[in-house]
Amino acid sequence: MSNIYDTANQIERELRELDEFKALQAAYEEVKADEAAYTLFKEFQGFQQGLQEKQMRGEEFTDEDAEKAQSIATKVQETAVINELMQKEQAFSLVVNDLNRIIMTPVRDMYND
């Protein structure tokens, strides 16, 4: 029997070869090539991370957080290359979600006996 971590590493290598990953990678390169879009994307990522950290600490979101989220979301929606990146990320996430569903089958089966 092979080592499960060897299998996981093989899956990681195969994910990099998927069309969905290659499309995501190409879309990210397009964002990076557009300085304004890349700056906005990094701001968006940082803001999202900050909100997640706030949520994990049990802090409430402020009106200022909501206003900034709306402002950044509007700018992101108006930026075609970022929208394309998000679409490609969503397509790749579907593959990852399918893999997670498959991997978690033993646990689901156990609880559904």
Curated annotation (Swiss-Prot):
Gene3D superfamilies: YheA/YmcA-like (1.20.1500.10). It holds the Pfam family Com_YlbF. Belongs to the UPF0342 family. This is UPF0342 protein EF_0681. The lineage of its organism: Bacteria, Bacillati, Bacillota, Bacilli, Lactobacillales.
